[in-house]
Amino acid sequence: MAFKLWLLDEETIYEHVFERYTQLEGQSGKLAQDLGIQDRRGGVLEITFEPSGLEGGRKKKRVRRRNKASSVEEDQNVAVDSYHVSVGQSISSLHSSRDNGNSTTGYVLWSTTPFFINWLLYSTSAAPFRLGSQVEVTCGSSCEGHKLELPRLVDLTGADRGKRGILELGAGISGILPVILGNFVDTYVSTDQKGILNKLKDNIMENLSQLTRKRCISRSLRLELPTVEPVGDADITAASLPSKSTLHLEVAALDWEKINLQDKKTHSLHPELSLIGETCSSVYVIAMDVIYNEYLIDPFLKTLKQLKHWLQTTYNLQFHVLVGIHLRSQEVTTLFLEKAIIEYDFTVYDIVDQVIQESRFNFYLIT
């Protein structure tokens, strides 16, 4: 069964937060009681993402070969590809008072991101983000029967002609979202503070082989489509050959404290953001575990407000935001929702799904 959306307002915020943290307390014996670092023991992490039960995945592949007519439906239903990434992280930088202006949480991989990837690609309940479909919305009797139309976040088949993009905020150093989700979108822009970017680029390049469904071009990573030797008198390039579709993948600095998209120099200051507007018809902003203290809330929401206004008014893009929160401080979660809904006037939905509710995480859809 697909997830449902609970439309939150200034009254239901508190009911939602109370219920979610009560659920969390009831599962305290099953869930890890830590801050959420994926693995603090090593400098290099090896992580595998795969469908639950590889035998099931192999069975699906055999069916697709025998019956091509059913392949689209099966591919859309759940991802069948597996991925293995190697992530270099820096525990010493995490505890440093000198690195990146003392903003160091991005130097390690936090567990919200791997959980989100597994849920998005392999959970049957996440199908609306893979299919692009209507999702049931609940918010009391006044919303009974209401549905929200969601564009695809990822296209597992490559058959959809719509152009989709992802803008990642607060990416950190891991680079695993772009090399995995980049297989299913047309443009991916990964952003963080300037001091994080070199390690982020290193990890993306290390795992570029996981982009199995795309050819990747990138100005920031200096990746170009290879040329092919001429055959006879023909001047043939890789771009002219029938092959994989192309992913535009960029890494860029984006400081939430300094961004000003009303500046007329936006195109020169943020060419990667312009790339999304110029190449896509819909964009999802993804932010995993970036709300962990109260000081980040206003800069983050101000950035979202600017991005939404600029991308919608300048490029007429469909704009959605997915925020993943590791449930630590109940006060921080409450303050984030209060400010998003009341002060910044965003429409915020809680993604209601059993798999998520059995974890330490929560995901919010913002429009």
Curated annotation (Swiss-Prot):
Name of the top EC class for this enzyme: transferase
Keywords linked to the UniProt accession: Methyltransferase, S-adenosyl-L-methionine, Transferase
This protein's record includes keyword Transferase: yes
Record: residues binding S-adenosyl-L-methionine: 110, 170-172, 192, 256, 288
Keyword Metal-binding: no
Domain of life according to the entry: Eukaryota
A molecular-function term among this protein's GO annotations: S-adenosylmethionine-dependent methyltransferase activity
Any one GO CC term of the record: cytosol
One Gene Ontology term from the biological process aspect of the record: methylation
Bias (Basic residues): 58-68
EC number: 2.1.1.-
Region described as Disordered: spans on this chain: 55-74
Family as reported in the entry's similarity comment: Belongs to the class I-like SAM-binding methyltransferase superfamily. RKM5 family.
General function of this protein: S-adenosyl-L-methionine-dependent protein-lysine N-methyltransferase that monomethylates 60S ribosomal protein L1 (RPL1A and RPL1B) at 'Lys-46'.
Name of this protein: Ribosomal lysine N-methyltransferase 5
Organism: Saccharomyces cerevisiae (strain RM11-1a)
Gene: RKM5
